[in-house]
Amino acid sequence: MTALSEIFVPLHRIIPFSNVEGQGNRSSIFLQGCKLNCLYCHNPETIPRYTESAKLVSLQYLYEQVMEAVPFIRGVTVSGGEPTIHHKKLVPLFKALRSQGLTCYLDSSGFFEFDRVCSLIDVTDKFLFDLKGEGIGLQTLCFDRKNQAGIVPQQVIPERLHIKNDKLERNLQNLAALLPLNKVEEVRLVFLKHFFDAEHLVGKVAQLLRNYPDVALKIIRVHSKGVRDEAGLSAYIPSVEETNALSAYARQCGINKILTIL
């Protein structure tokens, strides 16, 4: 077995103590790299897999950083970027941390290939699972890798689909697969207008969460501060009333554990 000191990942930053990245006080590790290019991304500097500001560190370094925070933490949450692109490398780290009684969470966009990531899923206690939306508007919202500047186009629903439908649907499919495994802590939806039908999506999520009342739905009203095209995105920000109405609709659909962030 390869030693932790011989496996390296690109690190964006570490927060030793955080109470917003899952249950209890946790250490949060932000890795570099994401296959998506979401227009509302507030950490676009983490999208490239390697940058001058990111450090290439060993798993042993990460393990030691986390262990320094014990006994003041319950576990660790690995975020990004998108942590599942490092799935093979994270498995030995999670095994080592769990052997010390720590829980291991993943903060994920949910667009990973489930079968390829199974070994990491097996050693992950919980997912903080992002829902990006649904339908062809996702192509513009999250999948236009050529739009490096993150400029919001005038036409957000594309006339032609360049992404395969199965890739667009992978988000919900992965959520449906993780729920029976008791692997989901919360589902998060960033709510913005016109890119997708938010009520229709919430209805689908309600069907999935029906038998999992302990899984929270977090509805987050998008904001433009810190995004790459603040002026362009501002036209798609829902009002407080619209956001509260979506939360009320989610409750009407049978979801009881809802957190609305305005």
From Swiss-Prot:
State the disulfide connectivity.
none
What detail does the entry give on cofactor binding?
Binds 1 [4Fe-4S] cluster. The cluster is coordinated with 3 cysteines and an exchangeable S-adenosyl-L-methionine.
Q: Which SUPFAM superfamilies match?
A: Radical SAM enzymes
Annotated positions binding [4Fe-4S] cluster: C34, C38, C41
List the InterPro entries hit by this protein, alphabetically: Aldolase_TIM (IPR013785), Organic_radical-activating (IPR034457), Radical_activat_CS (IPR001989), rSAM (IPR007197)
> Which E.C. number(s) belong to this protein?
1.97.1.-
What this protein needs as a cofactor is: [4Fe-4S] cluster
UniProt key word 4Fe-4S: yes
Q: Which reaction does it catalyse?
A: glycyl-[protein] + reduced [flavodoxin] + S-adenosyl-L-methionine = glycin-2-yl radical-[protein] + semiquinone [flavodoxin] + 5'-deoxyadenosine + L-methionine + H(+)
Q: Which domain of life is it from?
A: Bacteria
Query: What keyword terms does UniProt attach to this protein?
Result: 4Fe-4S, Iron, Iron-sulfur, Metal-binding, Oxidoreductase, S-adenosyl-L-methionine
What GO MF terms are annotated?
Answer: 4 iron, 4 sulfur cluster binding; metal ion binding; oxidoreductase activity
Q: Which family does it belong to?
A: Belongs to the organic radical-activating enzymes family.
Q: What is the designated name of this protein? A: Putative glycyl-radical enzyme activating enzyme HI_0520
